[in-house]
């Protein structure tokens, strides 16, 4: 586990606000526990949350029975544009295999406390997504579920809904909203099949060579450069924080 993970983009969690308001939840107590009014972050593209705030958010919301499907709803809302530069870079790729490589390279810009590793085998590609930072079981499982569902949403959009069957294995046990996962076919979910907390996605070769409709090599080059600059800035910010911490000891 890596303790030096930068703060996490707030943009994903902000997507829960409309749903919570639709469910007529009073968020006053939650905002007090977080020490901030999340709704004020909506217009801040680079707003961040600490892991402690995310732990508080998840544990508070999942206390309510009506919110047991929040991971599913959050994941389902994650279209490619939710990932900003990385999402647009994926859309600009030539084919699925190239897109998976780009996703792996810049996954820390999407979810910095998780890692995506892509392994190419005979006739199949395996995506391994696992945490880089220690967190409570409740928070970890929430994120694993949301990331898995979010992948389905983004993958279907990337292929313009022309997706062939593929398999998603998770370490978490079957959730109460399992019937809702039928909406994500042809993805097939397999729960409780992994020992290590993680997700493994198996994509067959017949999905990999699919040409993407918005492929644009010029745009991809520019977007990747911007992604690299963001990674460099995050690394620099981390070094500055480490230096300040050292000086204050």
Language-model segments: which ranges?
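N-terminal regulatory/effector-sensing and dimerization cores
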Residues: 50, 84-206
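Solvent-exposed amphipathic alpha-helical surface segments
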Residues: 23, 68, 110, 158, ...
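N-terminal low-complexity or simple alpha-helical regulatory segments
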Residues: 1-125
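Surface-exposed, interaction-prone regions with an acidic/low-complexity signature
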Residues: 3-12, 123-124, 130-136, 140, ...
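Long, highly charged amphipathic alpha-helices
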Residues: 15, 56, 60, 98-102, ...
């Amino acid at each position: 586990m890596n303790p030096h993970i930068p703060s996490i983009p707030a943009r994903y969690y902000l997507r829960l606000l409309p749903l919570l308001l639709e469910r007529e939840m009073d968020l006053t107590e939650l905002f007090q526990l977080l020490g901030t009014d999340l709704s004020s972050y909506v217009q801040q593209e680079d707003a961040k949350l600490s892991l402690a705030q995310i732990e508080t958010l998840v544990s508070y919301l999942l206390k309510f029975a009506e919110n047991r499907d929040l991971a599913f709803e959050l994941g389902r809302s994650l279209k490619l544009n939710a990932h900003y530069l990385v999402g647009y870079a994926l859309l600009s790729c030539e084919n699925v295999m190239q897109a998976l490589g780009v996703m792996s390279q810049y996954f820390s810009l999407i979810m910095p406390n998780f890692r995506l590793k892509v392994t190419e085998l005979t006739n199949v590609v395996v995506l391994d997504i696992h945490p880089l930072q220690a967190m409570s079981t409740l928070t970890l499982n929430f994120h694993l579920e949301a990331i898995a569902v979010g992948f389905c949403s983004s993958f279907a959009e990337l292929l313009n809904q022309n997706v062939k069957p593929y398999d998603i294995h998770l370490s978490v046990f079957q959730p109460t909203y399992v019937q809702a996962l039928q909406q994500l076919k042809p993805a097939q979910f397999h729960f409780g099949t992994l020992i290590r907390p993680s997700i493994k996605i198996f994509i067959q070769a017949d999905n990999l060579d699919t040409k993407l409709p918005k492929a644009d090599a010029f745009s991809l080059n520019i977007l990747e450069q911007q992604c690299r600059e963001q990674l460099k800035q995050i690394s620099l910010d981390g070094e500055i924080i480490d230096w300040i911490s050292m000086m204050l000891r």
